[in-house]
């Protein structure tokens, strides 16, 4: 089947020249970003603003999700000093909000949880005012791994459901209920923790299925939600079933807020970490003299 042609609202220009400074720093510190590995369409905008989502635990994933462009090979050993390098990048870039994520590392005994925790600690030691957001894998449902991450006290803990239960065959090795349980368990461990999840649209989901997932997330205590258009990285990946109109993204945002989510980012180019700093603004106290 031939791929569906992209509509006009999804024509976004990527300017490699705008990446030079950021890519130079990443190369110097031997760091990876999901922006590069996942071929994010927002890379020019974010790199131009000196923003990036750091990819720890290497560039190779142990799962075979059919929608993702991250490499699937034999994972390499962990990079010594990676957490310190991420912290150094955060400090040098002067980031007020940083997002840390990783490929799934089922080959590691704790799934990489200890590296997440160390990275948070390192960032806090050199840039204590920086808000730290983690976007974690499911750690195979291991409670001890999740506890190690929660105890590091990130400002936001994210875990993406990605799609509706009926389409979970595209998530190799994942389980819808396990992912929901992870979010719920994190809130039980730390009741004040801000939790977040994201969904890709255009994979073949129905509107009623989308709303059912929103209900499940709210029941799991998840207050933040991102909704964005799925874009197939290549013809070898899961094909796009539909390009969702911007008006529908706005409708879904209004519905999600009415259902009880605290903050929602919903638009064709929204990704998990896109405008990540906006989520915590709803929690910020008003300036003195206001409110």
Curated annotation (Swiss-Prot):
[4Fe-4S] cluster 1 binds at residues 35, 40, 46, 273. One of its GO terms (molecular function) is metal ion binding. SUPFAM superfamilies: Radical SAM enzymes. Pfam families: Radical_SAM. It catalyses: [[Fe-S] cluster scaffold protein carrying a second [4Fe-4S](2+) cluster] + N(6)-octanoyl-L-lysyl-[protein] + 2 oxidized [2Fe-2S]-[ferredoxin] + 2 S-adenosyl-L-methionine + 4 H(+) = [[Fe-S] cluster scaffold protein] + N(6)-[(R)-dihydrolipoyl]-L-lysyl-[protein] + 4 Fe(3+) + 2 hydrogen sulfide + 2 5'-deoxyadenosine + 2 L-methionine + 2 reduced [2Fe-2S]-[ferredoxin]. Binds 2 [4Fe-4S] clusters per subunit. One cluster is coordinated with 3 cysteines and an exchangeable S-adenosyl-L-methionine. Its EC number is 2.8.1.8. [4Fe-4S] cluster 2 binds at residues 61, 65, 68. Residues 47-262 form the Radical SAM core domain. This is Lipoyl synthase. It comes from Geobacter sp. (strain M21). The gene is lipA.
């Amino acid at each position: 089947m031939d791929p569906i042609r992209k509509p006009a609202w999804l024509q976004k220009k990527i300017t490699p020249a705008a990446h030079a400074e950021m890519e130079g720093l990443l190369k110097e510190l031997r760091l990876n970003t999901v922006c590069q590995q996942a071929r994010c369409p927002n890379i020019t905008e974010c790199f131009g603003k000196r923003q990036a989502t750091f990819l720890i635990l290497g560039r190779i994933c142990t799962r075979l999700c059919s929608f993702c462009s991250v490499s699937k090979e034999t994972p390499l050993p962990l990079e010594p000093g990676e957490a310190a390098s991420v912290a150094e990048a955060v400090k040098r870039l002067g980031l007020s909000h940083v997002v840390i994520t990783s490929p799934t590392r089922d080959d590691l005994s704790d799934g990489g949880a200890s590296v997440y925790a160390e990275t948070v600690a390192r960032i806090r030691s050199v840039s204590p005012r920086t808000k730290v957001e983690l976007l974690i894998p499911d750690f195979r449902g291991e409670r001890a791994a999740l506890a190690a991450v929660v105890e590091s006290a990130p400002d936001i803990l994210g875990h993406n459901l990605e799609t509706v239960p009926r389409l979970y065959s595209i998530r190799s090795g994942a389980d819808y209920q396990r992912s929901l349980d992870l979010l719920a368990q994190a809130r039980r461990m730390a009741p004040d923790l801000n939790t977040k999840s994201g969904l890709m649209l255009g994979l073949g989901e129905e509107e009623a299925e989308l709303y059912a997932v929103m209900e499940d997330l709210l029941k799991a205590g998840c207050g933040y939600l991102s909704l964005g258009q799925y874009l197939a990285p290549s013809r070898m990946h899961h094909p796009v079933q539909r390009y969702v109109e911007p008006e529908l993204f706005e409708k879904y945002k209004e519905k999600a807020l009415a259902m009880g989510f605290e903050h929602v980012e919903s638009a064709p180019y929204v990704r998990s970490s896109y405008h990540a700093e906006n989520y915590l603004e709803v929690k910020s106290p008003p300036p003195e003299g206001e409110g």
